[in-house]
Structure formats: structure tokens, C-alpha cells
């Protein structure tokens, strides 16, 4: 919606994709990049992924669309650099075409940062926030620090911040584009979205010492994040050191409902922090728009993820009657 701040009235409504959740301006504020949370095509389509919309502000119409990699869902946040040359988008890449028989190395889901070339208006590539042995589950907010040197992602499921050397990232991408084997695991440019080793050496993890870091900001020489479930404001220096916490009110986790919601979104109780319940059932335990082949009714019959809303009162939960 375009709202006139003087009259507080809606001036225009612009139709975009499914469940828009974030936006950022670029091209001298003449365009908006819109993040749509969910895939909008049928779950039997290919590719099946959430899309970004580029809105022309003057015409108030979608000028073009950018599709994220196949399996992309639960898009959360957008950040841009100072020059507005690149945008960084947090989301999941679900490996929904594989059987759900293991979690190792992101077999079911990987946690992703997609990089958008705003001048070319296309997807540059997507990099995995995970390592081969550890997930950075449920990436939420993303920022670029004021000096443009770091990208910070709040990994809400694994209870940490992911700190990436932005300068080194783009240098590595430029070399990989030329065919240089920038890390031992890099096989080709097109394989980067599947390579959990691509960020090796230029990314670290900063535990927030609480539950549910969903937002992150950086001002001056400080990084701030908020632990949603434990009601804490956390500050640290730009290197992720000298961490301080301040409790703000009664933690949500003190209530029975809040504690259950916390566990639902907590990937630290999962093998190697790869995923939480919210990975497949985001947005208050709803669906992710994908088909999955769960093994409790055999293999080879993928079905659309169901919302969990009232599912305990409406059995059976599987399409085959289980």
C-alpha cells in the first residue's frame, strides 16, 4: 500500500506475489524489491520457489520478477548495501524432492542467503549459511553493517548470529565466476547454492545466549539483536565480542503457550541444528507450499504440507488416512 503521511489515507495498492513480508528501495528510490514469503505456483510445478518482485514506483506496477532457487520458501528479510548495488535475502532452500530419511549435510533443508544484483536485476547466486556439520536454522533478519564490510543474519532457530565478511564474499564470488576453485568444496558456479563449504573461513557464528534472535541492527560500533522468547536485548561489538544482555519484561517462555512456541522454533533440539518444526511449518505452524515424501506411509507418494492449525482435533493428518 502507498500511504499519504499527511492525510493518512491509502493512495494506491500494488498487487505483488504471495504474502509479501519485506522490501527495500534501490535505483534512486525509483524501484522497490519485494520479498514474497511463499511459493505461489502449484506444489506440483517445477521449478517451485518463492519469487521477488521489482516494483516501479512511478507506474505502481511490478516491472519484473526474480525467482529464487528451486525449493526456496519462507523468505523473511531483505538488506541492501550503501550503494544499493546488491540485496541480500534470507530464506530456506527445501530439498523437498528427496526422501525424508536423514538430516545430514542439509539433506532436507538448507538455510540460505540469496544475493541479488540490483543493477542487472537478477539473482547472482545463493550461498548456504550452514556448514557441512551444522545448520544455521531459520534465518530471519539480515543487515549490512554501516561500513558495508559485514553481513549479519539472525539465525532464529539455531540461536545465533551469522557474521559474514562481505568484502571477502564478493571477492570469492568473483573468482568462482571465473572458474577458480576458491574452496576445496567448490565444484562449479552453478553448484554454489548446494555447497555448505562455500563460506568457509569468511563466516562465523555468535551465540546470542538466549532463545529466538529474530531481529538485528548495527549502529556505530555496536551490533544489537533481540531474543524473542527470553525477552532480551543483546549488544556486542562489531567482532561479536563483549556481549551484554538486558532483560526487557517477562520472557514469553515463562508461559505455557510461549514455552511450546519456543520449542517449536528451536533447532538446537534437532540433530546438528539443521531445522526446527517451523522449518516445514512456518508462520505460526502453517504450510510451506511444498510436497514432501514422509516415510510414515511409505516412500514414493509426496503430499502437500498441511497446516498444523487444529490438526490435533482433525485426524487423520495424512492424505492416505494415517
List PLM regions with ranges.
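Periplasmic c-type cytochrome electron-transfer domains
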Residues: 8, 64, 76-102, 109-112, ...
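Gly/Ser/Thr-rich loops at beta-strand to alpha-helix junctions
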Residues: 3, 25, 53-55, 158
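A short, structured loop/turn motif at beta-sheet edges
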Residues: 25-27, 56-59, 80-86
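A structural detector for beta-sheet-dominated domains
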Residues: 15-17, 26, 35, 55-58, ...
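Beta-propeller blade termini and top-face loops
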Residues: 5, 19-21, 34-53, 89-102, ...
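Asp-box/WD-like beta-propeller blade repeats and closely related beta-sheet repeat scaffolds
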Residues: 10-24, 38-40, 47-50, 62-77
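Extracytoplasmic/lumenal domain signature
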Residues: 3-8, 55, 59-61
Amino acid at each position: 500500500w502507498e500511504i499519504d503521511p499527511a492525510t493518512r489515507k491509502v493512495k494506491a495498492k500494488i498487487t505483488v506475489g504471495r504474502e509479501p513480508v519485506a522490501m527495500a528501495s534501490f535505483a534512486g528510490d525509483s524501484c522497490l524489491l519485494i520479498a514474497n514469503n511463499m511459493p505461489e505456483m502449484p506444489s506440483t510445478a517445477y521449478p517451485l520457489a518463492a519469487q521477488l518482485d521489482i516494483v516501479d514506483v512511478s507506474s505502481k506496477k511490478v516491472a519484473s520478477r526474480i525467482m529464487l532457487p528451486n525449493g526456496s520458501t519462507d523468505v523473511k528479510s531483505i538488506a541492501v548495501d550503501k550503494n544499493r548495488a546488491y540485496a541480500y535475502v534470507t530464506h530456506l532452500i527445501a530439498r523437498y524432492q528427496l526422501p525424508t530419511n536423514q538430516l545430514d549435510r542439509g539433506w532436507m533443508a538448507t538455510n540460505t542467503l540469496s544475493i541479488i544484483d540490483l543493477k542487472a536485476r537478477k539473482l547472482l547466486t545463493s550461498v548456504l549459511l550452514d556448514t557441512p556439520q551444522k545448520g544455521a536454522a531459520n534465518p530471519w533478519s539480515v543487515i549490512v553493517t554501516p561500513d558495508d564490510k559485514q553481513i549479519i543474519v539472525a539465525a532464529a532457530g539455531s540461536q545465533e548470529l551469522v557474521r559474514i565478511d562481505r568484502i571477502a564474499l564478493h571477492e570469492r564470488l568473483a573468482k568462482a565466476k571465473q572458474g577458480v576453485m576458491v574452496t576445496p568444496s567448490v565444484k562449479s558456479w552453478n553448484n554454489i547454492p548446494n555447497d555448505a563449504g562455500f563460506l568457509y573461513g569468511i563466516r562465523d557464528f555468535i551465540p546470542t545466549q538466549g532463545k529466538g534472535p529474530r531481529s538485528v541492527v548495527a549502529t556505530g560500533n555496536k551490533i544489537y539483536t533481540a531474543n524473542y522468547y527470553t525477552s532480551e536485548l543483546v549488544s556486542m561489538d562489531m567482532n561479536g565480542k563483549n556481549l551484554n544482555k538486558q532483560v526487557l519484561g517477562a520472557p514469553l517462555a515463562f508461559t505455557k503457550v510461549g514455552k511450546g512456541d519456543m520449542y517449536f522454533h528451536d533447532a538446537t533440539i534437532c540433530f546438528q541444528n539443521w531445522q526446527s518444526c517451523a522449518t516445514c511449518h512456518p508462520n505460526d505452524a502453517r504450510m510451506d507450499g511444498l510436497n514432501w515424501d514422509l516415510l510414515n506411509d511409505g516412500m514414493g507418494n509426496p503430499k502437500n504440507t498441511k497446516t498444523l492449525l487444529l490438526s490435533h482435533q482433525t485426524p487423520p493428518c495424512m492424505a492416505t488416512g494415517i
